[in-house]
Structures are given as structure tokens and as C-alpha cells.
Amino acid sequence: MEKARVYWFFGLSGSGKSTLSDAFALRLNDFGQHVFRLDGDELRKGVNKDLGFSQEDRMENVRRAAEMAQLALKQGFTVVASFISPEEIHREKVRSVLGEYVEMIFVDASIDTCRTRDVKGLYQQVEKGNIKEFTGVSAPFEMPNMEELRISTDGTTVEHCVNVLWEKLIVSRK
């Protein structure tokens, strides 16, 4: 197993970031890695509950998460993070904080798939007009141009996605 790294999963709400990150973290743990898990929803309930969704607040959300990932990394943890990270400027911030230790993983799913999954009911809230600035619908999501890896979750299983990630991120780099 390689040294500790940060695996930063990003994509639209409902793309499967948290589900895939959880499963990937379990696989890493099964192979002896000490994993520290960071999730955007969880941070917004606690550490980042003072932040809204303005451009400045989104950047601060990502910056804080990247700084937390760096602290865990310095303690020898492998970090698995899942954050929407909607714009390239956010992803550049992650790269600037974490440098060579970060693997950016774009979790790609069509907007229709995301709406179908909508476990939090957010897309319904957007359609009702209750949420104004929603990434991918009424707020921008910039398709990545420098991602390290793209994984599509449309029409496939979590297990298949984890196997693909494992092969590309772990096995092929031994």
C-alpha cells in the first residue's frame, strides 16, 4: 500500500460522491490504511455551519476542508473527501493546499441521474423555488479540465466503481 494521500471526490449533488467515497474508504481501511473521512454535508452541519453559498463562502468551505485534510495527512491518515467543488477555482484551491498529495476524482453523473437519486430532496426544492442558487441547475458547475480521474456512476454499481478506482489509483501505481 502506498503512503497516505488525499482522495478528493467532486461532482454534482446526487452524483454519488458520498456513497462512493464511503465505499472507497472502507476498501482502504480493509487494506490497512488509517482513513480520515471528510464530507461536505457533514462539515456544513458543524465546522462550516457559519457559511452560506455565496462565491466567497463556497471558497472558504473548500479551503477549510483542504486545510483539515492537510492536518490529517500530516498525522499519517489517508483522507477521503467528498465535496461538490463546483468551479475550477475551488479545485485549484484544493490543489494549492494539498499539492502532490491529492488525487482529484470527478464523480460524473447526468443531471437526470442526480435528480432521480435526490435522497435529500434538494432538486425538488429547487423546482419549487425554495432553493435559488443550486449547483448544476441555477448555479454553475464547471466541468473539470484537469481532473486526475473521471468515474461515471450512471447505470453502474458502487462496487464496480470502487473496483475501477482501486485499479487506477492503487494497483496500477504499485
Regions found by a protein language model. Name each.
Residues 108-111, 116-164, 171-174:
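Small-molecule kinase domains that catalyze NTP-dependent phosphoryl transfer to phosphate-bearing small molecules
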Residues 1-6:
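Extreme N-terminal, non-catalytic leader segments
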Residues 9:
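Hydrophobic anchor at the beta1->P-loop junction of P-loop NTPases
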Residues 21-67:
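Conserved substrate/cofactor phosphate-moiety recognition/catalytic segment
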Residues 46, 50-52, 69-127, 133:
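ATP-dependent NMP and nucleoside kinases share a basic, alpha-helical "lid"
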Residues 17:
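Conserved lysine of the Walker
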Residues 13:
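The conserved Walker
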